[in-house]
Amino acid sequence: GTHILKPILPSHYENYQDAPANEHVTMLMARTIFKIPTALSALLYFENGDAVFVTKRFDVVDSGEYAGFRLSQSDFAQIAGLVPERDGEEYKYKGSYERIAELIRENVSAADVAVEVFFRIVLFNYLVCNGDAHAKNFSLQNSVENLDVYDLTPAYDLLNTSLHIPNEQSRTALDLFKDEDDFKTPFYEANGFYGTPDFMEFARRIGVVESRARRFIKQAIDAVPVMEEMLDKSFMSEKSKALYKENIRDRAKALGY
């Protein structure tokens, strides 16, 4: 198939009816406000009125000489060698974003560009309260023009998980740093959550230029009013719109400390 359909979540999640609209507006914000390459997607409705999130597969070539050809794609759990048999059921939550950035540098020829995009996605996920951006939600795939060249795939599975799991144990699915058991910034020690000092240290470690990292963080904080306008136009319930706005204000405040 060329598309993936994601209907409403099981009802034991909070605000479960809004899950398709949540993912739709979050992907839209990433693409239009933050200029992050994302999988193409849309929100459709079944005859009974239930919403369904539809995303276009980016591992299947849809036109030209190679139409129908499936590109080779590996997520970062696979690339890191994480398997449930050895690493347990929570294997995709092992590792760190810093380690993923290292693996990008090991496998992507245009690594500086790819690592910067990765930094922007991690920052965006933090802002929108996506607490499920684990190792399987980032992938590499080869190019149709050159099957030996790999690059970061468009971003996918972007949504505000706090709407559905309001008491998530952690703000991020993975630690920012490889040595988080032994290292914490003074900001994190004082506040118990990530802020700009943490993301600047993350940028330094993975090789994102300091001035550009600062600009991306400022853009994230400054984007909240435009994000709220887009949320107002979304297809979520009024309750979920209000919660989402509250969430991003809270994260922007954390970044703006």
Spans of model-derived segments:
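Catalytic-core segments of enzymes that bind and process phosphorylated/nucleotide-bearing substrates
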Residues: 75-98, 142-210
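Residues within well-ordered alpha helices
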Residues: 29-30, 202-206, 230
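Short, surface-exposed acidic
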Residues: 40, 206-219
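Conserved kinase catalytic-core segment
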Residues: 17-34, 93-167
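Short alpha-helical scaffolding segments that buttress acidic/His motifs in well-ordered protein cores
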Residues: 118-122, 217, 230
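Conserved ATP-binding subdomain of kinase catalytic cores across diverse folds
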Residues: 1-88
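A glycine-rich phosphate-binding loop feature that marks nucleotide/adenosyl-phosphate handling sites
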Residues: 45-51, 137-143, 220
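Regulatory N- and C-terminal appendages and interdomain linkers associated
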Residues: 106, 113, 146-152, 221-257
